[in-house]
């Protein structure tokens, strides 16, 4: 009995560029401000896919803290991908967060003190994120596919020949899948950080999920599903 094994390998080439600016400053004695702005470009190429896959984006964050007690932050991502049609290629995804470090309040220090309550912070954030994961490569463009040798019939005798025909279904309106995320909670440390507690509530609502709209004929076993569309929710 003869056995045969086959082995193969593939190469992935990644080219990544990132550049950023950072700013920090203390205004007076109680106003702490900072900002970060970053540009990123990513390119991936594999042996089986000659055309590179590009992503690029601009990411920013601005933070403010007053007297180490009251915190506020705004962040955003302006992301681009060639997986989407030109008019929808870039998406803007902002987020905001607030925080309150209660243990830094003078009345807490006077009444409870740092020995019992080392640290307590309340926080909350709300933001929008987007992803192009799961979108087939160049799905927004029509394609041609090579047919078999008996696809077309010509002449009186019906000679069978191959050729090219319409490829897989496509969707010129495909866009980002988006998620709204809410997160609120508190962090507590007691007795000089000997005990740590944390409470967190998280909620996510996703829309424009890429899925297929099945027709009655498809469900009954005839026909085929339509193109992937951004119609799903969770």
For the regions a language model picked out, list residue spans one by one.
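Extracellular/periplasmic, surface-exposed regions of secreted and cell-surface proteins
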Residues: 1-234
């Amino acid at each position: 009995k003869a056995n045969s094994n086959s082995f193969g390998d593939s190469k992935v080439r990644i080219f990544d560029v990132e550049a950023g600016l950072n700013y920090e400053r203390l205004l007076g004695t109680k106003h702490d401000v900072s900002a970060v702005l970053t540009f990123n470009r990513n390119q991936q190429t594999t042996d089986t896919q000659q055309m590179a896959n590009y992503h690029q984006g601009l990411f920013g964050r601005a933070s403010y803290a007053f007297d180490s007690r009251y915190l506020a932050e705004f962040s955003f991502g302006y992301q681009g991908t060639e997986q989407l049609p030109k008019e929808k290629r870039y998406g803007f995804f902002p987020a905001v967060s607030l925080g309150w470090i209660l243990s830094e309040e003078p009345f807490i220090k006077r009444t409870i003190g740092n020995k019992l309550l080392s640290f307590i912070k309340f926080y909350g954030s709300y933001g929008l994120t987007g992803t192009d994961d799961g979108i087939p490569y160049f799905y927004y463009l029509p394609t041609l596919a090579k047919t078999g040798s008996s696809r077309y019939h010509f002449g009186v005798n019906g000679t069978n020949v191959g050729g090219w025909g319409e490829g897989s279904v496509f969707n010129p309106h495909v866009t980002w899948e988006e998620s709204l995320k809410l997160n609120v909670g508190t962090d507590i440390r007691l007795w000089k950080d000997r005990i740590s507690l944390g409470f967190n509530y998280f909620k996510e609502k996703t829309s424009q999920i890429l899925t297929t709209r099945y027709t009655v004929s498809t469900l009954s076993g005839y026909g085929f599903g339509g193109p992937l569309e951004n119609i799903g929710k969770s």
